[in-house]
Amino acid sequence: MTNDHPQPPAGTRAEPPGLTGSPFDSDTFTSATFVTVGRGPYLAVAAVWLVTRVGMVLLLLRDTLGIGGVRREVDLYRYWYGQFAQGTFPPGDVTWQYPPGAGLVIMSPGILPWLTYVQAFVALTLIADAVVTAALARADSARLTHGTWIWVCGLPLLLHLPLARYDVQTTALAVLALLALTARSTAAHQLGGALAGIGAMVKVWPALALIGTPRGRTTREAWTAAVVAALALLATLALFFSDSLGFLRQQGSRGIQIESLGGTALALAEAGGIWPGRVAFRYGAFEYVGPYVSSLGHLALLLTVIAFGWLLLWRVRAHRWTAATPLDAALTAVLLFTVTSRVISPQYMIWLLGLAAVCLTSRSTVMRPVALLLLPAAALSSLAYPVLYDHVVAGTTQGLTVMVLRNGLLLAATLLAARRLWTSTVTGPPEESA
C-alpha cells in the first residue's frame, strides 16, 4: 500500500500538518486542530469539562443573562413532577407536548431526595453530560478525536441552557445508541436499538439514529429491539399513569415559532412591511399569528414529508456503507427534520452537537465541515436566546440579523450534510466485499 503522506527522515520530529488548504477532508485533521492536549488527553478533557461546566452552573445560579428566566423551565418540570406523583400525565396542559417517556426524566430527580428538585435535575443533567463525554472519549481509546472536543467545548456555547432542559439526557440516549450500533455483536445492535427506542419515547428524534443502520442483520436486530423497547415502555407507563398519550392533542394547533426558518421568513416580511402579522405567546412559546401562517405551517409539514421521502430514497439507493455511515445518516436526518420544523427551540442545538460529536469519532465520517458549521450556529443560538431574545421577539435589526445568520448556518449545514451523505454512499464506488 502506498502512503500519500510523505514521512520525515529518520531521527527528525514530524511537524504538524499544514493548514494552507482545507483541513476538512484530511485524515490528519484531529483534535489538535482545536486544542493541544499534550501527553494527557483524558486529563485535558476532564479539566476543560470541569471548568466549562462550573461556568455553566454559575450562569444558571445567577440566571440574569439577557432576558433571564432560563431556569423557569425546570420549575415547570417540578410542577409536572407533582402531577406524576398523583398518577397522571399533565391533564389538559397545552405546554405538555412530549412523548410519555419524558415523564421518566421529569420524575428522575426523585431519586435524589436530599436535594431540591432543581438541584437534583441539574446534577442528573451533569451526570448525563459526563457519560456522553466519557463514551465519546472511549469510542476511540487510541487517540482522542475532535468529536470529544466538539461536545466538551461546543455545549458551553449554549451557555447555561443545557442544564435547564432535559435534552442532554435525550441526547445521551441517542449517542450511546449510535456508539453501540458501531459494534459487531448482536447484543450491541440490540442494545443500540433499545436505547434508540427508549429515546424515541422520550423525545421522538432519537429514533432517527436507526435510519442509517446497514441493511440485513444489523437493521433487523436494531429495529426489532427499538420497537420492543418502545412498546414495553409505553405499555408500562400506560399501566401506572393515566392520559399517557395526552400530548398528541397539543401538537396539531402549533403555529410558526419565531426561531424557526418559517418564523425568520415572516419576520423579514414584517420588517419589510409586506406582512401584517404579530407575535403572540401560545403553547408555551412565542409564535407568529396572522395571514398565511396556517399555509406556511402546512408547507413546513409538506417539507418534512419530502425530507422523510428523501431519506427513504437515500436508504434504497445507498450501496456503500462505512463505519461512519449510520452516524452521518443520523446527523443528516435530524438536521433535515430540524430545518423543516415549525418549531426550532434553542435546545435543538444540543441534539445536533451530540450527533456531530459522534460522527467525528470516526475517521471515515464525511460530516467534518457540517460539524464546524454547527459551532457558530450554537453560539448564535445563545445570542438569540437568552441574550437578545427581546430583540428577536420585537423583530429589531439585531434580532433579525442573529436569526438570519443562525438559521442560514443551519440550512447550509443541512444541505451540505445531505449532499455529502448522498455522494459518499450513492454516487461513490460500490463497497467491495471482504
Residue ranges and their predicted role:
Residues 2-11, 19-249, 298-434:
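Multi-pass membrane glycosyltransferase architecture that uses lipid-linked
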Residues 79-82, 92-116, 256-291:
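Short hydrophobic/aromatic helix or loop-helix immediately within or flanking a transmembrane segment
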Residues 288-300:
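Membrane-water interface at loop-to-transmembrane-helix junctions
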